[in-house]
Amino acid sequence: AHARRLAAEGALVAVNDRVASPALDELAHEIGGLPVPADMADREAVFAGLDRASEHLGDVDIVVANHAYMSMSDFLDHDEDDWWRVIDTNLGGTFWLIQAALPSMRRRGAGRVVIISSEWGQVGWPRATAYSASKAGLISLTKTLGRELAREHIIVNAIAPGVTDTPQLQVDADAAGVTLAAMHEEYAATIPLGRIGVPEDIAAAVAFLADFRMEALVGQVVSVNGGSTRTRA
């Protein structure tokens, strides 16, 4: 949804997934963009991907760090490999992605970085220890880089989505032994807006934060969750 929204507003978009696939190629073709498969936990792959994007599309001036890896288990069941896979992908991958894109933004004299964190990075979530910690780290990265890069007109902000209607929700429903409709209803009951999010909600926020006419919002976290965090202590 983010890629389609930015392309519709005139951006040349490089789209990423961990591995090459027909679906990635089809999306890139649909929006007139470029498929750039790369494992975001691999620093060399991230830098190579940015080089490929720059070679084909020109200097990068907008980065949307939307990649994520999640696992859920009781705290004592998180093993070392699982912990580092989550941290290296979510937090490390974003760190490398911004490092790789920064020279392009400096050449252009401006840039926009939109980091996709999570509501769980703000409030935490049981059994999602590594994921929540990684997403909280992204919020700190946003605030720090926001302060560091703003004078160069490179503006860094984050989005913290709440529960959103993606394929992961079906996985969660199956794991809980309930129907998808029941899970929608359960989550919606806790959200002041009365519904869970949809990808287009997040895409609209991405487009806003990527807009070069908007510069005074720096190092902020935009909570796109229908007001759900306002219902918690």
For each feature predicted by the language model, list its residue ranges.
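Canonical Rossmann dinucleotide-binding motif of NAD(H)/NADP(H)-dependent dehydrogenases/reductases
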Residues: 1-14
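Substrate-binding pocket helix/loop in short-chain dehydrogenase/reductase
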Residues: 74-75, 79-87, 183, 187
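Active-site helix of classical SDR
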Residues: 98, 134, 142
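Alpha-helical segment proximal to the catalytic Tyr-Lys
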Residues: 103, 147-151, 215
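Residue(s) in the substrate-gating loop at a strand-loop-helix junction
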Residues: 118
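Short C-terminal tail/terminal secondary-structure segment
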Residues: 123, 207, 218-233
